[in-house]
């Protein structure tokens, strides 16, 4: 038993903890980027590889490592509508991370079950579409109040801002990033 506890402690302190066990074939640059970013106490980065070089895998590796080491217990992933289920499947299939998909219907059900509850406090790992939160001030406020450790934003290049105009989702992004310590933009 003592040997098992010693071995467990060694594994928990391993420099590759969170990078092993994922069902992925990594490219060398992905491991390097994931290791560099995950070693930061509170990562705030823009992952800007070329199309097809695995930004999603890099972000998932970082997320997995931060979650396993307890530095990102509450994670909010914002993605375009068309990618919600793809992210859900990839995170579960490749990293065995079980996220909850949030949309208006799910929020309504959670609020019906317990009046006055913030639905975003019901799950630790949440995926929702950027447009869902950007189109509802109530849901955006609830998400903001939920106290996340890490925000992951896919297709961040769609969040445009200039002195004369901004994309519809940019104010949401700006507000969330001001309050959430960790940030991964893809």
Predicted regions and their residues:
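Active-site alpha-helix of zinc metalloproteases
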Residues: 44-45, 150
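A generic secondary-structure signal marking the coil-to-beta-strand transition
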Residues: 43, 123-126, 182
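Short hydrophobic/aromatic beta-strand immediately N-terminal to the Walker A/P-loop
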Residues: 45-48, 76
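Phosphate-binding P-loop
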Residues: 35-44
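Interdomain "pre-motor" coupling segment immediately N-terminal to P-loop NTPase/helicase cores
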Residues: 1-9
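SF2 helicase/translocase NTPase motor core
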Residues: 9-30, 35, 55-58, 64-175
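The conserved Walker
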Residues: 51
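Conserved helicase ATPase motor motifs in RecA-like P-loop NTPase domains
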Residues: 179-186
């Amino acid at each position: 038993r003592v040997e098992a506890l010693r071995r467990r402690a060694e594994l928990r302190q391993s420099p590759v903890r969170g990078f092993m066990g994922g069902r992925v074939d990594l490219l060398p640059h992905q491991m390097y980027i994931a290791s560099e970013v995950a070693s930061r106490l509170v990562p705030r980065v823009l992952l800007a590889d070329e199309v097809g070089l695995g930004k999603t895998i890099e972000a998932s590796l970082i997320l997995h490592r931060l979650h396993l080491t307890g530095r990102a217990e509450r994670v909010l992933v914002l993605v375009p509508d068309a990618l919600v289920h793809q992210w859900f499947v990839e995170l579960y299939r490749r990293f065995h991370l079980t996220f909850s998909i949030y949309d208006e219907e799910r929020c309504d059900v959670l609020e019906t079950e317990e009046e006055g509850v913030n639905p975003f406090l019901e799950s630790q790992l949440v995926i929702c579409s950027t447009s869902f939160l950007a189109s509802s001030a109530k849901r955006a406020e609830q998400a903001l109040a939920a106290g996340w450790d890490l925000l992951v934003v896919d297709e961040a290049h769609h969040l445009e801002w200039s002195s004369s105009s901004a994309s519809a989702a940019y104010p949401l992004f700006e507000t969330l990033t001001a309050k959430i310590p960790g940030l991964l933009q893809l």
